Amino acid sequence: MTKKKISIGIVQENPIVGDIEGNLQLAINAIDKLSKQSSPDIFLFTEMFITGYPPEDLILRDDLLDASYEAVEKLCEVKPESFIVIGYPKKEGDSIFNCAGVLRN
């Protein structure tokens, strides 16, 4: 049985709280940079990367939650053959969760 090695690219960036578009671009740039260096199978981002951390009361705004989800959807298209693990908030009913999304298109 042949074992396949999995490479993980860990992204250490400093997303700005509330800057969804800027943080999305920061994520895309990090993926591009890591792809050129080592082409990892998995790109691993930090907690609440999409919104920046800590989002505090911004997390209660529906427009921020909607923008976060849209950013995650866009991120799915960036590197469809790889896995992207990234933190973002998700609303389910009246609850808001601190999620780690595992993305692959």
Where do the protein language model's features map onto the residues?
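Hydrophobic structural segments
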Residues: M1-N105
